[in-house]
């Protein structure tokens, strides 16, 4: 019996061996069909479609529809029995019997078919093609065997969870998380001796001629692109290479003024242009060296701190508070009652008489005025008292 029939299942051809089901399907001699029998006998055609349920149902319906009509014809004896061999006693098994025999084959064949189905399932899973589009209630998958539809048991696929799960991506194809694609430079500073960078002071300190100008807009754009591509912190370039603060460099790069009207930033832009002319490896290395090494290599003088306007003196050299003698204090109070704002000549005369500095005399009168309550000036009070003593009216103010 020839079992070389094949069945196409979702693009894959399943070949049946010659000895497949040889123990269960008997060999039947093929004879010409009698002319009296209509072509609606229980012999379904070979299915080549993918709709398993339709083919199996079609075969069952054909068997069911022909069973009633054939039984009446067989009983009447008007036509020979098609399922008998030469009109003898041996009948060919019906389609239902073939199905029942096939369903009762031993565990070895079940394991063989299960292995074939597992292989097919793995193949379809790799190509991301669904294994079978049949309902979970269907447990039979028809296969054409010698012009008969033999139903083979098929493992029912497990029901998937309701939640959608994204297909797993191999680790080799996984992309890095956002923000981790670019390797950040190490924060540890490197040594100039390891890189072998020589003296760059002549290159970094060169100046252009008086009749030449630099394109500040272009230099600013190139600096920003270089910092972004090489992952260089702006503060490192500003402090170590340019000798400026990070805020000053940010202002120069954000709003670069034309070279003609620029006054204070020309040296910084000249140094930036010299830095851009260096090799890319050297440019990046200068920004991650120690500040002292960069200053030594590039010949940049370290910035000196601004001198404080008033330096603190040691505690033993502090200026002590001046104390007046009682005679000096009485003389100054007497003059203050008569004139709270003495002129320069009067202050000099007092300082010479009392043996004091003129600044000390001036400070005394200023402090005395601050201690007075907010009232009429001392000179007006003295005039008013003098008028009362002599029974004369005081000064009147006419507005």
Curated annotation (Swiss-Prot):
Record's subcellular location:
Nucleus; Chromosome
Q: Region annotation Disordered: residue ranges?
A: 32-91, 158-187
Residue ranges flagged as DNA-binding region: 205-291, 315-374
An example molecular function term from Gene Ontology annotations: RNA polymerase II cis-regulatory region sequence-specific DNA binding
* InterPro entries tied to this protein: CUT_dom, CUT_Homeobox, HD, Homeodomain-like_sf, Lambda_DNA-bd_dom_sf
Q: In which tissues is it expressed?
A: Expressed in hermaphrodite gonads.
State the deletion phenotype: RNAi-mediated knockdown results in viable hermaphrodites as in wild-type.
* Gene Ontology annotations for the cellular component aspect, listed alphabetically: condensed nuclear chromosome; germ cell nucleus; nucleus
Q: Pfam families recorded for this chain? A: CUT, Homeodomain
GO terms classed as biological process: negative regulation of transcription by RNA polymerase II; primary sex determination; regulation of transcription by RNA polymerase II
Q: Which UniProt keywords apply?
A: Chromosome, DNA-binding, Homeobox, Nucleus, Transcription, Transcription regulation
User: Could you tell me where the Low complexity compositional bias lies?
Assistant: 60-79
Which PANTHER family does this one have? HOMEOBOX PROTEIN CEH-21-RELATED (PTHR14057:SF32), TRANSCRIPTION FACTOR ONECUT (PTHR14057)
Family per record: Belongs to the CUT homeobox family.
Functional summary from the UniProt entry: Transcriptional regulator which is involved in the sex determination and X chromosome dosage compensation pathways. Directly binds to 5'-ATTGAT-3' sites in the promoter of sex-determining factor xol-1 to negatively regulate its expression and promote hermaphrodite development. Associates with condensed DNA during mitosis.
Q: What is this protein called?
A: Homeobox protein ceh-39
Q: Which organism is it from?
A: Caenorhabditis elegans
Biological classification of the source: Eukaryota, Metazoa, Ecdysozoa, Nematoda, Chromadorea
């Amino acid at each position: 019996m020839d079992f070389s029939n094949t069945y196409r299942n979702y693009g894959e051809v399943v070949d049946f061996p010659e000895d497949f089901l040889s123990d269960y399907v008997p060999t039947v001699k093929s004879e010409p069909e009698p002319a009296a029998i209509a072509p609606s006998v229980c012999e379904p055609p070979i299915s080549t479609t993918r709709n398993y349920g339709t083919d199996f149902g079609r075969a069952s319906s054909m068997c069911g529809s022909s069973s009633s009509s054939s039984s009446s014809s067989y009983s009447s004896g008007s036509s020979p029995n098609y399922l008998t061999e030469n009109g003898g006693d041996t009948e060919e098994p019906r389609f239902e019997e073939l199905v029942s025999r096939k369903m009762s084959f031993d565990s070895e064949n079940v394991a063989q078919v299960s292995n074939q189905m597992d292989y097919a399932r793995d193949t379809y899973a790799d190509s991301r093609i669904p294994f079978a589009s049949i309902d979970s209630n269907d447990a039979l998958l028809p296969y054409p065997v010698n012009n008969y539809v033999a139903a083979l048991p098929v493992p029912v696929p497990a029901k998937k969870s309701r939640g959608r799960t994204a297909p797993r991506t191999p680790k080799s194809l996984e992309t890095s998380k956002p923000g981790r694609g670019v390797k950040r430079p190490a924060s540890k500073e490197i040594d100039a001796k390891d890189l072998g960078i020589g003296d760059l002071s002549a290159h970094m300190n060169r100046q252009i001629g008086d009749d030449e100008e630099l394109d500040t807009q272009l230099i600013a754009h190139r600096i920003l692109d270089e910092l972004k591509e090489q992952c260089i912190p702006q503060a490192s370039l500003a402090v170590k290479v340019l000798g400026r603060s990070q805020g000053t460099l940010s202002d120069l790069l954000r709003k670069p003024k034309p070279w003609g009207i620029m006054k204070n930033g020309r040296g910084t832009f000249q140094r930036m242009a010299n830095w851009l002319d260096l090799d890319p490896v050297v440019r990046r290395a200068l920004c991650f060296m120690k500040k002292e090494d960069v200053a030594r290599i590039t010949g940049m003088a370290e910035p000196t701190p601004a001198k404080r306007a008033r330096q603190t003196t040691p505690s033993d050299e502090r200026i002590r508070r001046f104390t007046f003698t009682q005679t000096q204090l009485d003389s100054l109070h007497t003059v203050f009652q008569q004139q709270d704002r003495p002129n320069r000549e009067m202050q000099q005369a007092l300082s010479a008489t009392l043996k004091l500095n003129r600044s000390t005399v001036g400070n005394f009168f200023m402090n005395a005025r601050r201690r007075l309550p907010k009232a009429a000036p001392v000179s007006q009070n003295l005039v008013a008292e003098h008028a009362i003593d002599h029974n004369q009216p005081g000064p009147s103010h006419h507005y």
